[in-house]
Regions:
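Non-catalytic accessory regions of SAM-dependent methyltransferases
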Residues: 1-83, 87, 110
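Generic alpha-helical secondary structure signal
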Residues: 30, 34, 96-103
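Glycine/alanine-rich phosphate-binding loops at beta-alpha junctions
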Residues: 89-95, 111
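Non-catalytic substrate-recognition/targeting regions of SAM-dependent transferases
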Residues: 63, 67-73, 98-120
Length: 120
């Protein structure tokens, strides 16, 4: 059962297999999850063709999720790590709401990209 005030969304894993239930504050976070997954798939194909091991997956594509998400992959092992940077929210956005959106994104990123939480 989700924490009070939170809702469950389903996030497919990076390989397109299992779906993961993720607790979020805003049900609209599903839109961020879908965008992140789509961009990761496109960039993963490009990176494989180009022989690139570090690249940006997401760069504030959606106005409510003002983040940059970069993926770094070990050339030898293929093990990945993700760096997330938050852009400053506009002054008209409530700070608590922006913090909840960041929390939602940080919950979505590990299953969506197939990276352990400790590597985000």
């Amino acid at each position: 059962m989700p924490e009070l005030g939170k809702t469950l969304i389903t996030v497919p894993d990076a390989a397109g297999g299992a779906e993961h239930a993720v607790e979020v504050w805003d049900a609209d976070s599903a839109q961020f999850a879908a965008r992140l997954r789509k961009m990761a798939k496109e960039r993963r194909k490009w990176a494989a063709r180009a022989g690139v091991f570090a690249y940006r997956i997401y760069d504030a594509d959606l106005p409510n999720y003002a983040l940059a998400v970069d993926l770094y992959r070990e050339a030898e092992t293929g093990e990945a790590a993700v760096h997330v940077a938050e852009y400053e929210a506009p002054s008209h956005i409530d700070e608590a709401k922006a913090a909840r959106r960041l929390e939602d994104a940080l919950a979505i990123i590990p299953p969506a990209l197939g990276v352990p939480e400790a590597r985000v």
